[in-house]
Amino acid sequence: MRNFAMLLLLILLLHSLASFPICFARLFPMSLPFTRSKAHQMHFFHPYLNPSVAPTPSPAFSPNPSRIPPLRHKGHHRHRRWHLRRNATAVSPSSHDCQQTCVEPLTSTPFGSPCGCVFPMKVQLLLSVAPFSIFPVTNELEIEVAAGTYLEQSQVKIMGASADSENQGKTVVDINLVPLGEKFDNTTATLIYQRFRHKKVPLNETVFGDYEVTHISYPGIPSSSPNGDVTGDAPGGLPIPINATTFANKSQGIGFRTIAIIALSGFVLILVLVGAISIIVKWKKIGKSSNAVGPALAPSINKRPGAGSMFSSSARSSGSDSLMSSMATCALSVKTFTLSELEKATDRFSAKRVLGEGGFGRVYQGSMEDGTEVAVKLLTRDNQNRDREFIAEVEMLSRLHHRNLVKLIGICIEGRTRCLIYELVHNGSVESHLHEGTLDWDARLKIALGAARGLAYLHEDSNPRVIHRDFKASNVLLEDDFTPKVSDFGLAREATEGSQHISTRVMGTFGYVAPEYAMTGHLLVKSDVYSYGVVLLELLTGRRPVDMSQPSGEENLVTWARPLLANREGLEQLVDPALAGTYNFDDMAKVAAIASMCVHQEVSHRPFMGEVVQALKLIYNDADETCGDYCSQKDSSVPDSADFKGDLAPSDSSWWNLTPRLRYGQASSFITMDYSSGPLEDMENRPHSASSIPRVGGLILPNRSGPLRPMRSRRNFFRLRGSMSEHGGPSSSRHLWSGNGDWL
């Protein structure tokens, strides 16, 4: 009797310990797992998972403790998988002879059974009462479940209770049914399963209310749980239990595959977000006003053959936003003005402020608020050429800096308005002075030299090298001291290296366009040289390049002037009558010879602009001229003509000497410009012969039709071998001044 009382007291103590976690859960969130203790030793059963109809024999003990390897799952339940976790343990009831820790999903045997770890049958019930009503009566729940399943109360363990996520007024209770032996036999397991499935386990409805069985799992039971969950198969052919929602297994680890998928998905999501943000930022920048245009450096759009096609009708209809997107890579280092500022500066573009008008717009004189005088070019033609010219001119002028090039101060892009703001050159253009006023001889020479310097800079020293393509008298502006400035770069194109031409649609002004460009569309730097030669003839003759008021056959300046360059009488007839008695005939003849070569029909016979500059510097001594951007080693290496001594270097084919024979009765020292169709380096390796040395003073300026090369590091190849005062007899060089009034 005493032993029975002790046993009963021990059972009550164990039930109290079992109910303690549920009571303790009132103080903490119900989703937390119960705290478990660990023991230093544990003994495990090796359960036999093969189904057996016969009752299970008594468990056999192993003398040495061993662990059961984790079982691999094959089934699914609510799309979740379970694994045996070694760090999640179930505490076995304390007894006087057994202390051990079991690894889930195993649990310790009930009190009174040999120590070991077995598979429990996991049952999940949904009670229609609140959790706080369950905690005080967990012991009664164990008793009623045990009675309804024909088990001992010690075989029923309440593992957890929590409020239902969908209805807080209901309670989810997780129950473990533990076999007394190694496992439930199939008959017992099936019987328990059927009683729960058909709700034949009676529970006190007054205390627990109605209940639903949401999940049952145990190896050997049918593959479907009461709510349709499908179980897997454990090794040995038995279905393996899948996780019920209990406190003991809520903290399962996440598999490596799941972690990898989550990480990869996050990375892809980040990339998508970054790309979307970049696109949004880009479009916001494009949509900003013109004040957002900042300096940048990019290749010229004119280098692309299809530059004109970039302005489609749809792009033109989108206003300034389209242009801003096209100019996103343009080289802009200029100020941006608003349309209101320009309207105020030009009296709302008053006709009284018009300085001139070209093919693409008008130029207005403007006065800014700070007193700066500017020239505002308003593009008026509303077509694709307008925007193309605008971008071309901004690109060119923002990168070109030379004293003989007009300076771009700023731009304006607002709606459909396009404006270029230049420094104001007060003294008008060469055209206005030639045909509406007068220019003395010195001013004309100064203009010729300065304009040549500007073109030489474009062709040889700028980066990239530029072909102006619309050089004419109206595009050469004059300062008060008649210093010329080349303007209007709307048709400019980037020059290619070497002697290759650029195939392009013919653009320019009648009378100034080179014949090869007009006939074939092949554009070269020598095409600009031809245009310069026409302007030089204008300076000499005072006539327009095309004048329909002239007699028949004399409308074209070049056609009319060419035969007049052959003799003295022709030169006297050609020169502007307004210059009578104000010029030196020898200087005029030299300028005429330069002009004749510049407008030569053959491209290879035209000089380069750098050579024209050197020739003009020998004719016109510009004392006030300081060395500009174009100056290089070649400029400083040329001595003044008064210091020439010695003989001239050989010149077998001089481009100067290719001029027509001139006959006039006065000896004159002349310049011999040596032309070579090969590279510059070949000039110094050409054989010298006595017969090839002319007996006239002058300077050899080599010309070449080969590829363009940087001029800054070019060696000095001007050779002086004579005196300007010497006028020897004829030599073997063709078309040289003989001293007898003839060109040999």
Curated annotation (Swiss-Prot):
Annotated active site: D470 (proton acceptor)
Composition-biased stretches (Pro residues): 59-68
InterPro entries from the UniProt entry: Kinase-like_dom_sf, Prot_kinase_dom, Protein_kinase_ATP_BS, Ser-Thr/Tyr_kinase_cat_dom, Ser/Thr_kinase_AS
GO molecular function, one term: protein serine kinase activity
Enzyme class: transferase
Gene3D superfamilies to which the protein is assigned, alphabetical: Phosphorylase Kinase, domain 1, Transferase(Phosphotransferase) domain 1
Reactions it catalyzes: L-seryl-[protein] + ATP = O-phospho-L-seryl-[protein] + ADP + H(+); L-threonyl-[protein] + ATP = O-phospho-L-threonyl-[protein] + ADP + H(+)
Extracellular side of membrane: 20-260
Residues where ATP binds: L355, G356, E357, G358, G359, F360, G361, R362, V363, K377
UniProt PTM: Autophosphorylated and phosphorylated by ACR4.
Biological function: Required during the differentiation of the protoderm into shoots epidermis and cuticle.
Name of the protein this chain belongs to: Receptor-like serine/threonine-protein kinase ALE2
Organism: Arabidopsis thaliana (Mouse-ear cress)
Gene name as annotated: ALE2
